[in-house]
From Swiss-Prot:
<dbReference type="GO" id="GO:0043022">
    <property type="term" value="F:ribosome binding"/>
</dbReference>
<feature type="binding site">
    <location>
        <begin position="10"/>
        <end position="17"/>
    </location>
    <ligand>
        <name>GTP 1</name>
    </ligand>
</feature>
<keyword id="KW-0690">Ribosome biogenesis</keyword>
<dbReference type="GO" id="GO:0016887">
    <property type="term" value="F:ATP hydrolysis activity"/>
</dbReference>
<dbReference type="Pfam" id="PF01926">
    <property type="entry name" value="MMR_HSR1"/>
</dbReference>
<keyword id="KW-0547">Nucleotide-binding</keyword>
<feature type="binding site">
    <location>
        <begin position="232"/>
        <end position="236"/>
    </location>
    <ligand>
        <name>GTP 2</name>
    </ligand>
</feature>
<feature type="domain" description="EngA-type G 2">
    <location>
        <begin position="179"/>
        <end position="355"/>
    </location>
</feature>
<protein>
    <recommendedName>
        <fullName>GTPase Der</fullName>
    </recommendedName>
</protein>
<dbReference type="Pfam" id="PF14714">
    <property type="entry name" value="KH_dom-like"/>
</dbReference>
<feature type="domain" description="EngA-type G 1">
    <location>
        <begin position="4"/>
        <end position="169"/>
    </location>
</feature>
<feature type="domain" description="KH-like">
    <location>
        <begin position="356"/>
        <end position="441"/>
    </location>
</feature>
<dbReference type="GO" id="GO:0005525">
    <property type="term" value="F:GTP binding"/>
</dbReference>
<dbReference type="InterPro" id="IPR006073">
    <property type="entry name" value="GTP-bd"/>
</dbReference>
<dbReference type="InterPro" id="IPR031166">
    <property type="entry name" value="G_ENGA"/>
</dbReference>
<feature type="binding site">
    <location>
        <begin position="185"/>
        <end position="192"/>
    </location>
    <ligand>
        <name>GTP 2</name>
    </ligand>
</feature>
<dbReference type="InterPro" id="IPR003593">
    <property type="entry name" value="AAA+_ATPase"/>
</dbReference>
Amino acid sequence: MPLPLVAIVGRPNVGKSTLVNRMAGVRSAIVHDEPGVTRDRLYQEVEWNGRRLRVVDTGGLVFGDDSEFLPHIRQQAMAAMAEAQAVIFVVDGREGLTPADVEVADWLRKQPLPVVVAVNKCESGQMGLAQAAAFWELGLGDPIPCSGIHGNGVAELLEAVLAHLPEVTAEAAGEPDPIAVSIVGRPNVGKSSLLNRLVGSERAIVSPISGTTRDAIDTVVTWEGQPYRLIDTAGIRKKNRVQYGIEFFSINRAFKAIQRSDAVLLVIDALEGVTEQDQRLAGRIEEEGRACVVVVNKWDAVENKDTHTINEFTREIRDRLYFIEWAPLLFVSALTGQRTHKIFEQVNTVVAAHRKRVPTAVVNEVLQDALAWQSPPTNRQGKQGRIYYGTQVADRPPTFVLFVNDPDLFKDNYRRFLEKHFRQNLDFTGTPIRFLWRGKSERLVGRAVRKLERSLTSR
């Protein structure tokens, strides 16, 4: 059963995102003392007293002004209302009732949804009651004083809104766990357009202005029965071009989005090719051990393509992103939809590899085959490397322990050969793999292996 949805609306800078973060118990939406910080619809799950719901945070509503992003923000708020079963109307208790609040209230009265008025920034209990009383004249029911910063009144607010929603417990909401997929890249490479193409609706504001998306935005979409949590992030810039403030928080949020992803779509601009920032971002994905698909966007805009063009682009990308050469490439157009239908297929492939577990017997068969192809190196003193045994100790990413006589005997070129051999024989497309080299004498290997296997079976 899908979770009921509550839309959070109000004029700019009344603390909607702070209140949403308090309800959800996380700091997801960017919170900053600047009007218009939240531009898109941001979804989060909330659990309260065994009940579950989703809330959608929207940008600040301003009527009668069509400058900058304001029409887009109104469009996003209306889309949120179309999905929702109830509304929390957030106002500022410190400022009191304003004409802008009255405009929003007039608009809400025309909507066929129950409305709960949350009077935010009421840090004092007794004073909060007096502050909330000023909003009775809106005619939208009992205003509830609360504080997104301190948390007081939030329980009462949740109880009030849950009274308007169908009861869905944590158990009743059971469904396959969504695969978390972050969409990252430099500004203006088409991340939000790609998200909208995958979702099939204008979920995030799409604009040619660099830096339109400020938050990491989560959208859940289901494809062939599998839910995916798509995370659209602010474009990554060089540090010396980032001013401290909103964009600083957005870039930090984008890196954190990579951390909480199962797979990452690294979006490259086909017209600009791989840049230094793309390389740094790819390095971050590898460091975090995340599965990855490299999505080359704007392929429709590449002129004079022939049968060799895609191979030439592939060679250039592989040369510049050599440290994630294991990541599959997709040449797509978010604008026309060209090949975007293959993205979910590729995500499934790389996530399966990222989560793969290989039996110990198979690991050692592959090791013996590798040794038959290329013997371990010998140092200048005539001492040759020996690999006694290997076993997988973790997934996400797949991680193997190799017991050897001396790890220093195995230089980078042999380690790369071994990784390539594992990839060819065990199909680790789209995921980094790790090797932990443990020096042991042959006499002690059996004891170490038994100890390791006992620790794995006790987990």
